[in-house]
Amino acid sequence: MTRVLFATSEVFPLVKTGGLADVSASLPEALCRLGYDCQILLPGYPAALKAAREAGSRRKTRFRYGQYDVSLWQTRLPGTAVTLWLVDCPALFDRAGDSPYQNEEGEDWWDNAHRFHLFGRIGAMLALGQLGLAWRPDIVHCNDWQSALIPVFLADSQDAPKTVFTIHNLAYQGLFSHETFRALGLPDSLWRYEFLEFHGQLSFIKGGLVFSDAITTVSPSYADEIQTPWFGNGLDGLLRHKSSRLHGILNGIDTRQWNPEADPHLEFHYGADYPANKSQCQARLQQELGLEVCGAPLLGFVGRLVEQKGLDWLLGVIKPLLERGCQFALLGSGEHHYQESLKAMVREWPGQCSLTLGYNEGLAHRITAGADIFLMPSRFEPCGLNQMYSLRYGTVPVVHGVGGLNDTVFDPNEETPEQANGFVFREATPDALHAAITRALAAREDRKTWRKLQENGMKGDYSWKNRAGEYAALYRNLIAGNDRIHED
């Protein structure tokens, strides 16, 4: 049985700031169902350790690394049979607040480099069998900058396992000062532009890109995009150089957590073959959010209120859509000026526009089920999960044709009626977004056309089964001595 160590900085339901947490829960479980022994490595955040203690788990080993006392806990990811290892270092990971990266004022923890440097060191020690555990991986799968130093620390070991590094969002690179590089005690040989130096800064993510045996990202389109100056965040040249090792594998979703036929967050359930209760979900959502219960088109948005998610474009189209009678249900948090602009919109349009700041898992499900149209006008989107959730729930998405949105949403102007499941705009402007929403609203008026779009979306396969199989093929080929995904 192939053993995989899946190193991540967040995993649902223990800690979540975005899609990484969902992937880190569902992909390892899918790999286990394929017969892999996939175990997760996670920093020992308070919520994770609390869950471990409540489950009766215990420390497996305790040691000192440099100035830090470290313990390793073995437990299970809640609700699954997947083994979860927790790196318990109170000095670095016992922090207040819900975010693993920021304090309660929204500022990055000053010692994030030290925190995830230690996480990388412990990951490498576990991978090399140096912690006295009766388990050692054949593959170490690292995710985003927080675990990107693990391949660096394994590079000089002759018997190190193969490494895979997945880019979930290239915009987050783990950049720190040269002084921090020195403080971490990293060897001077790594301070070179072809290794960890990036325009005078230490780049954690370059560790994964330069030293891993294979690189993946979360959609085929994003794999192409990040090799261009427009999406490469200064690393496009390196990624073009590594293109033979770079693979775009589309994310899946947990189709048990996201299932309109049995969703515990919904009062009414429905499916592709019996869609009637979707309107009941909408009425309940309108009541919950203080919106008028009527037949008006309801547009939903769930995500971070930041420029990347196209909030400036969205703000440019909300008012004219409200004026024509549309309703909005918005859930998220982010930049202060976007929050204030949306609050003003809610005050101006009571009963028609709702904003819930923060993140609420249950409400996210209810918006996904209750809306007619789901908006994802992202400037860039490595994969995106919300559009797949909305498709599965028969809520027709309107998206910007980038990254994984381009790979999962198919416009009737570009595809056959049998394939079309949403609306795509290509030009990066508010006018293009407005035009796509207008087309969606027009389609909604034609019941047969709308029902076909919903049906196509709901019957799509968004599960991890095939996507996990692509990772499994990559693992097998790495162990066999090459980094191809598809076997001959």
Curated annotation (Swiss-Prot):
Binding, ADP-alpha-D-glucose: 16
Pfam families: Glyco_transf_5, Glycos_transf_1
Cystine crosslinks: none
GO BP annotations listed: glycogen biosynthetic process
EC main group: transferase
GO cellular component terms listed in the entry, alphabetical order: cytosol
Entry-linked InterPro entries: Glyco_trans_1, GS/SS, Starch_synth_cat_dom
Top-level taxon: Bacteria
Pathway where this protein functions: Glycan biosynthesis; glycogen biosynthesis
GO molecular function per UniProt: alpha-1,4-glucan glucosyltransferase (ADP-glucose donor) activity; alpha-1,4-glucan glucosyltransferase (UDP-glucose donor) activity
Position of the signal peptide: none
Keywords for this protein: Glycogen biosynthesis, Glycosyltransferase, Transferase
Catalytic activity: [(1->4)-alpha-D-glucosyl](n) + ADP-alpha-D-glucose = [(1->4)-alpha-D-glucosyl](n+1) + ADP + H(+)
EC number, as in UniProt: 2.4.1.21
Role, per record: Synthesizes alpha-1,4-glucan chains using ADP-glucose.
Entry similarity comment: Belongs to the glycosyltransferase 1 family. Bacterial/plant glycogen synthase subfamily.
Protein name, per record: Glycogen synthase
